[in-house]
Amino acid sequence: MKKLRFTIGTIYMLIALSANAQSILPPVMEWKGKSESFIAKTNNPWITTAEKSGFQTTPDYKETMRWFKKLVAASPLLTMVSIGKSVEGRDIYMIMASSEKNTTAAALKKSGKPILLAQAGIHSGEIDGKDAGMMLLRDIAFGNKKSLLNKVNFLFIPILSVDAHEHSSPYNRPNQRGPQNQGWRTNAQNLNLNRDYAKIDTREIRSVIQVMNEYDPVLYMDIHVTDGVDYQYDITFGGLGLQGNSPGIAQWLETTYKPAADKDLTANGHIPGQLLTALNDIDFSKGNVLTAGGPRFSDSYGNMRHMASILVENHSLKPFKQRVLATYVLLESTLKLLATQGGALKEITEKDKAIRLAKVPMAWKVPQMDEMVNFERSANVKISVAAAAPPDSLNLLGIASRILKSPVTNADYVEWLGKPITMKIVNYKGTEPTDFITRPKGYWIPPSCDDIIARLKLHGIKMEIINEPREVAVEMYRITKYVYGDDNHQLEPFEGHMQVSGTTKAETRKQLFPAGSVYISTDQPLGDLAMVLLEPTSKDSYFSWGFFLSIFQRTEYMEAYVMEPMAKKMLEDSSALQKEFEEKKAADKVFAKDPTAILTWFYSKTKFYDDRYLLYPVGREL
């Protein structure tokens, strides 16, 4: 009994602590909106858990899937399929909403209707999309929204990170207003799914990419909730903007999609905004930064695939109900727009897929900044004093704040005051392409890189397998310098990998590729993606993610008693080598005093030296 009293007391204490954490959050703005009419009445047999609880809670995995299975069984418009299993054995389900009788991938594509693929719960604490999708699919099946499927097919993944969804707690996201039970950011392997699109380590992202390959959606939506600053917007969303490899799609998202969605959201009482990342994390007046991350991110990956991609970031400080309803409106608005504009978007997409740049940028830079920035490194960067052009401006619907000095840490921190204000701020954009790589005809990959080949296949990249050895004239990279660690050279693992960066020197050579090698032509829609994954200087290449660490290991060597007389003989036989040796010692004093380095240098000049040492094994056919 004492143990039971302690348990109950502990629960009450934890609930009180959770409530106290919520009370520390900035003041909440009162909200009423037309979209509240979408909330089911209490007597509706298909009312969701979120609606029933007044948007205090969200259903767990079992309850969610049980509800969906009943809904699907009752409606001829809905089909439910498992697209994969998590490492803990949970099915990752996708709901297909279509007026077509046959909902196979081939049949849906043959129907000619544009396909919207939307996913929720890639970060399962940010679960608004799941509850919004439940409500919308309910209204499509049994409400007044059936007509949404007249000209569009809708694929919906309610929970992508299913294991993390069950790692639920009221303490997972202290800077977010509801629901009371929130899932975890990373999956059961502690991997962030929204850093996995390029390397595809996880079953969850492999499942999503398989859906992309099979169904070929015309638009892809990834629904999140922010971490960060306060402002008036309850929903922010958009594509990459002008930065990226799909200019036609970018233009459509900016000039057609965003205005239409903004109009519908505003009409329903919401305040939509563009994607926001503060340049200074305690002072938004310093500006906003929009950058293109690599294809590790969902929206950047979609851009590399030439697939219109929308990143949704609901505002964490707005109440759960308001965020869910905003997501409902956005999903419905997207379906309506695709019904009239989906054909045009398909044509634009095909044009982007046909682009074959002679030189492909591996990154995008903010012209007004000296430093490279990305989503994970954008706060407090330095602005260039010699900027080529002034940045755009943005009328930010912000919240008044003040900077306080902490009595605990003695550092400055921001306090949001809950008062709406409008600020005109600079809006920095990563629109300058950089780190260009000349497009090769294709890449040759030996069978020893079978893991890389398998991952490229999973991406849907087309390749040819050779059954006989083939000698090919190729360009190959020799790694001349390399550093382990992230962009700041911090030697620590990131997303299950030890990252590496290096400089390369190109070597033209005839290389024998064994049977089982593959050839990947860059003359294909996913040619740019292949380049970003295979070029070592790309931050999201398999080289950079540490898949080729074995090339940094030397496995054969020569003893000094062999190398010393050989080096002496080499100098006697070649005055040119003697001159090169003297110049090397004069230029590198550390080398001149290091006997091992000297003998290694001579060893590298012999035919005994391992030619594969520091040689990146992928060949470029020019």
Predicted features and spans:
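Soluble metallo-hydrolase cores and metallopeptidase-like ectodomains found primarily
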Residues: 62-116
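Active-site/substrate-binding loop(s) of hydrolase catalytic cores
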Residues: 110-119, 127-284, 290-296
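Acidic/histidine-rich, surface-exposed loop or edge segments in extracytoplasmic proteins
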Residues: 37-56, 118-120, 191-192, 432-439
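Accessory, solvent-exposed terminal regions and/or long lumenal/extracellular loops of proteins
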Residues: 526-529, 534-622
